[in-house]
Amino acid sequence: MNKYFKVFFFVLLTHALKSSLIFGQATLQKGLSLDIDKDSTATDRLVVKHLDSDKQGYKVYTFKKEGWEYVNVKHVYFGERLLRVGRDNDMRCDFVHYVKVFWKGDVAPFFIKMNYYNWAWVSTRLHFKLNPDLTWTEVTVLTLDENAEQGFTTLFKQKLDEFASQVGDDVLAKYKPFVDDPNKKRFDLKATDEKEETSKKKYVLMVVVVVVFVVVASLVVFLVKFCLK
């Protein structure tokens, strides 16, 4: 009888450790870009992609009253649909324009899709809440000669900047400037790596699960032995 309880305890412990590892990994996803799957039923499903080549050309622009500014996306939280950006100051904007460039084989044309997002400030946390108020636009950029005098990268970035400026002019007509509230507490968004903190939480959870199962298993064994007497 005692042997069966040991086997049962081992199976439960293995399952608990596996579940805690999966749970810990699912709490935080890191990446360099943000995508929204518009074609599936879950239109606001966030997808993080790690980019290794400029040919994939992902950029994120924030539109402020002063103009355009590049923002590097640091963390995406899937469960809460919150986005953290690697900035040293407040990200004060009403629109975010996300440019995604599709590379067809080894040559152009490029297909650029630009999405419009509205940011809502979450006052209790150092994040902005992502509201997928989406407008979808697709344009074709003419083939760029990689051997041109200015170089491929320079021309490509110029095309992106020109395209962003054109869209910005259309948005400006509807733009509502961010209004500062002197009584509102300011938050600073800092570029932080929360992977270490997540790992600590994962291991703490594992320890707690192990302790709980040891106590429960010991209690079950004790009760069985007591009943068999």
From Swiss-Prot:
One of its GO terms (cellular component) is membrane. Residues 1-19 form the signal peptide. It is found in: Membrane. Keywords: Membrane, Signal, Transmembrane, Transmembrane helix. Residues 20-203 are extracellular. The chain crosses the membrane at residues 204-224. The keyword NAD does not apply. It comes from the Eukaryota. Residues 225-229 are cytoplasmic. It is a single-pass membrane protein. The keyword Calcium does not apply. This is 23 kDa piroplasm membrane protein. It comes from Theileria annulata.
